[in-house]
A protein has these predicted regions:
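Phosphate-coordinating loops and pocket residues in cytosolic domains that bind phosphorylated ligands
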Residues: 19, 171, 180-181
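GST-like fold's C-terminal all-alpha helical module
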Residues: 75-171
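Active-site-flanking alpha-helical
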Residues: 48, 144-145, 179
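Residue-level signal for nonpolar/aromatic packing positions in well-ordered secondary structure
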Residues: 29, 43, 68, 119, ...
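Terminal-tail/helix-coil boundary detector
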Residues: 178-187
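Positions that flank functional sites
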Residues: 13, 134, 184
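GST-like domain detector, emphasizing the conserved glutathione-binding G-site
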Residues: 1-106, 110
Length: 187
């Protein structure tokens, strides 16, 4: 967005943080008006609309905004949760043996693949997820596609349009800065 910001690492169970976000989840944005904003989709939409010069809000028509909402919801409600069984298999079984946990991870990996299949079909022949310009949804996809690339044998080889999109986003200066701020890449 080109605006200064401060990224702060928090412990979601910290009582001080829970005053900001009682759900104890990240992210949260202090908008400066006394009402913190939570949920990634809401925060990204807010930032895109309050910083229009960044050009991340996409087509401002009702249908254009509906498409942004649809794809943002896809990542929030379909893609992100598909990783839960992979990263936290103990949440999905009462068994604690490695064989049972491996089966849960395998089921999660299958869900991730299905989500990538849907995204691949959508991105085939496109440069961006929504419309003809980069939007906040493109940036929002980066962490989840990065996870997929790291957990799947062969990375993103089976999803060439997803891989191309992800590589373009990794080269984006704003994405690069955010990843550097998160300690995911070196300065």
């Amino acid at each position: 967005m080109g605006e200064p910001y401060e990224a702060v690492r928090v412990n979601p169970s910290d009582p001080e943080y829970q005053k900001l976000n009682p759900a104890g989840q990240v992210p949260a944005l202090d908008t400066g008006d006394g009402a913190p904003l939570t949920q990634c989709s809401a925060i990204l939409g807010y930032l895109a609309h309050t910083h229009p010069d960044a050009g991340l809000a996409g087509d401002e028509t009702p249908l254009g905004q509906a498409y942004l909402g649809r794809w943002s919801a896809f990542f929030t409600g379909d893609v992100h949760p598909a990783f839960f069984p992979v990263f936290m298999p103990q949440r999905y079984t009462t068994a604690d043996d490695e064989a049972s946990l491996a089966k849960v991870r395998e089921a999660g990996t299958a869900l991730v693949r299905k989500r990538l299949d849907l995204l691949q079909a959508h991105l085939d022949g496109r440069t961006h997820i929504v419309g003809d310009t980069r939007t906040y949804v493109d940036a929002y996809s980066v962490p989840m596609i990065r996870w997929a690339s790291s957990i799947l044998p062969g990375g993103l080889a089976d999803w060439p349009a997803v891989k191309s999109h992800h590589e373009r986003m990794l080269a984006d200066p704003g994405v690069e800065r955010a990843m550097r701020d998160e300690g995911l890449i070196e300065s």
